[in-house]
Structures are given as C-alpha cells and as structure tokens.
Curated annotation (Swiss-Prot):
SMART domains: HhH1. Coiled coil: none annotated. The RuvA-RuvB-RuvC complex processes Holliday junction (HJ) DNA during genetic recombination and DNA repair, while the RuvA-RuvB complex plays an important role in the rescue of blocked DNA replication forks via replication fork reversal (RFR). RuvA specifically binds to HJ cruciform DNA, conferring on it an open structure. The RuvB hexamer acts as an ATP-dependent pump, pulling dsDNA into and through the RuvAB complex. HJ branch migration allows RuvC to scan DNA until it finds its consensus sequence, where it cleaves and resolves the cruciform DNA. The keyword Cytoplasm applies. This is Holliday junction branch migration complex subunit RuvA. Residues 143-154 are annotated as: Flexible linker. InterPro entries: DNA_helicase_Holl-junc_RuvA_I, Hlx-hairpin-Hlx_DNA-bd_motif, NA-bd_OB-fold, RuvA, RuvA_2-like, RuvA_C, RuvA_C_sf. Homotetramer. Forms an RuvA(8)-RuvB(12)-Holliday junction (HJ) complex. HJ DNA is sandwiched between 2 RuvA tetramers; dsDNA enters through RuvA and exits via RuvB. An RuvB hexamer assembles on each DNA strand where it exits the tetramer. Each RuvB hexamer is contacted by two RuvA subunits (via domain III) on 2 adjacent RuvB subunits; this complex drives branch migration. In the full resolvosome a probable DNA-RuvA(4)-RuvB(12)-RuvC(2) complex forms which resolves the HJ.
C-alpha cells in the first residue's frame, strides 16, 4: 500500500501530476482543489495517497493532507460513488465546502457537481452525516481561498484546451466543458485558473 509520496514534480497535466520518487515516476490523480496548491514542476511536493486496484488498472489518488484523503475514502464507501465521482466532487468543492454542504443538507449545491443527481445528493447527505459523527475531532479546518498567479507558459488556446480536457476527465461532457471554459476564458489565464473559475462558476 502506498500512503505517502515525497518527490519532485516532473509534469502537471490536470488532474494528473507525475511525481518522481527515488527514480520512479508515479502518476497521481488529484482533485483540482488539491492540484491548485501544488508547487510548479521541478519543485518538491508531498502527497498523501490512496491506492485503488481495478480489473483494468491500478490508480493512485493524491491529496495535500490526511483529512482530504480521509474524506475521499469515506466518499467511495457511499453506494453509487466510485473514485472518479469522488474526485469530481472534491474538484468542484473543497473538503470544507463539501462538509458544510452535507451538514447543512444543501442538496441544491451538491446536484451542481458532475454526475450528482438529486437521489445521489440525498444519499450522500444521509450517509456522510452519520460518518462525520463517527469521526473524532475536527475533520477539517476552513482554509482561505487561494489566489492563483498566472505564470508564463502555454498560449491562451493551449490553456483553454487543457482546461476543457481536465473538465472532461472530471466527468463533464465535452460540449458542456467547452461552454464552461469559453464563458470565463481570458488571454492572461493559465489552465489551472480556468479550471478553478469554471468549476466555481458552475456552483
């Protein structure tokens, strides 16, 4: 079981990051809310991971702290919620925002996430509220919204295409992803900024 990785970021292709540890490159899937906090390629990062084995693949999911990983593991225990949907949920909302939505029973907020219908939202609220009660201490502490800079890099068209691809990977349909990005696109924004703003605008 791989529970934690510390290494150098080789590539960032939302929502994937390639992290080199002891000469081995690990491809890690991360929620966009965690991806935003990663340093730039070439710098060191620490991610807490959850290893998922499927018939057709072995996948690593990464998080910036143990609390986010705990929430992911609780999410995939919910009936009808697999790793891909859990990743989409935590990309559309931070861990704290999701906890707040569940505790306040905000069905309307949850159904705006890709792949979440009313029944799934109601199931999440019922099951996750019970699990939150069983967890000791404060599961999460509120974090201030991150202000992203836009370092020099790909062109605006490249950034938009990368943002659309990331949204599709998170469960949005291609046409919907294109529409979301085009509504908030601007020349000075990198792909991470576009993804963040598109997800925020969808909620």
């Amino acid at each position: 079981m791989i529970g934690r990785l510390r290494g150098i970021i080789l590539e960032k292709q939302p929502p994937l990051v390639l992290l080199e540890t002891a000469g081995v490159g690990y491809e890690v899937h991360m929620p966009m809310t965690c991806f935003y906090e990663l340093p730039e390629a070439g710098q060191e990062a620490i991610v807490f991971t959850h290893f998922v084995v499927r018939e057709d693949a072995q996948l690593l999911y990464g998080f910036n702290n143990k609390q986010e990983r705990t929430l992911f593991k609780e999410l995939i225990k919910t009936n009808g919620v697999g790793p891909k949907l859990a990743l989409a949920i935590l990309s559309g909302m931070s861990a704290q925002q999701f906890v707040n939505a569940v505790e306040r029973e905000e069905v309307a907020s949850l159904v705006k996430l890709p792949g979440i219908g009313k029944k799934t939202a109601e199931r999440l609220i019922v099951e996750m509220k019970d699990r939150f009660k069983g967890l000791h201490g404060d599961l999460f502490t509120p974090a201030a919204d991150l202000v992203l800079t836009s370092p020099a890099g790909p062109t605006a068209d490249d950034a938009e295409q990368e943002a659309v691809a990331a949204l599709v990977a998170l469960g949005y349909k291609p046409q919907e992803a294109s529409r979301m990005v085009s509504k908030i696109a601007r020349p000075d924004a990198n792909s991470e900024t576009l993804i963040r703003e598109a997800l925020r605008a969808a909620l």
